[in-house]
């Protein structure tokens, strides 16, 4: 091993900063530099959780990691034995960021401001002597005979900064080449395959990157008139598959959002992509999978309120606007009496409450957390060190790997965990 180890961290996001900080603590004599292609670091951390930074989750409601990590759950289970959500919670509190856990088990800084996390990471890295270079975009990696890795950067002229201020409206770029003994790729998820070219050129297999965590566009105009309505909890599923999710559902001016939809989009990411985001979604508005219990509930309403109008009694306390919409969707008049429903009407009502179908016509955005599934195949990675099996001295952390999660702080937890593991081994 050389006396002075030069380490490059490519990507100034959550995984990159965590890897750099842990590497510097474990290998204090190493020269470590974070290279970020944009003019500011930790941009995604800044906007996650609506700017409050949902940095992890208590995992109290997760019985199987596959619930949280549709892809990569086996690796995360293995790595959590070394650095899990409790370690991350303690790490930030020990580094000066008090945290709070909400009722939904999401963890935020007490300040409710993502800059508390950003300042902690940037200041800790600087204090330890980690260098930070913005406006450096990696364009090529070459293996040298002395086992170093030669990195080629496209550098935007004008000094990069941490605040995000642009140095010029039309920056001029130059090419720079630097050799390093160790390199960690922490560039996050990429929506385009060509973004992985310098890694596939080295021989890495790339799982096709496609969107995950998105909302659904719904064709039904009358349904979209219910925008702003929240129903919680519900079950969502895709008929003909085992894909399902649960949680609150938000009706928007374009269709459906909320955890019940975002979770489903994550678990069904590849299926939805293969079907060009044109599918049917089933909504169980009453969050009850036992149809017999729903039937008992409806019969109870009829017995207790035979002369009442449908509109006046809301099963399962459904929101008024949604209930009126469902009545009309069934072809019933709101003034119809409960005693007039009959067996056929009751069966239709039960079906509507438990298996209400809508046509999905494309996906919307989830601006708080842009996530892709796909990336570097885990088959190419040493699962203990996260070093490449294809290219020695090259490591990976974060969403650049084929790991992704549902919303709720799980993606950032994967960044902390994989960054920590890389920081333990990159200087060995």
Model-derived regions, located:
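Beta1/beta-strand and adjacent pyrophosphate-binding region of the FAD-binding site
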Residues: 2-15
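Glycine-rich FAD pyrophosphate-binding loop
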Residues: 8, 24-50
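Residue-level recognition of phosphate/Mg2+-coordinating polar/acidic sites
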Residues: 40, 61-64, 81, 87-105, ...
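N-terminal glycine-rich dinucleotide-binding loop that anchors FAD/FMN and/or NAD(P) in oxidoreductases
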Residues: 43-76
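Short beta-strand to alpha-helix junction loop
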Residues: 76-84, 104-123, 187-194, 217, ...
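Predominantly flavin-linked oxidoreductase catalytic cores and closely associated redox partners
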Residues: 115-116, 120-319
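A conserved FAD-binding loop/helix module that cradles the flavin
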Residues: 187-197, 202, 402-428
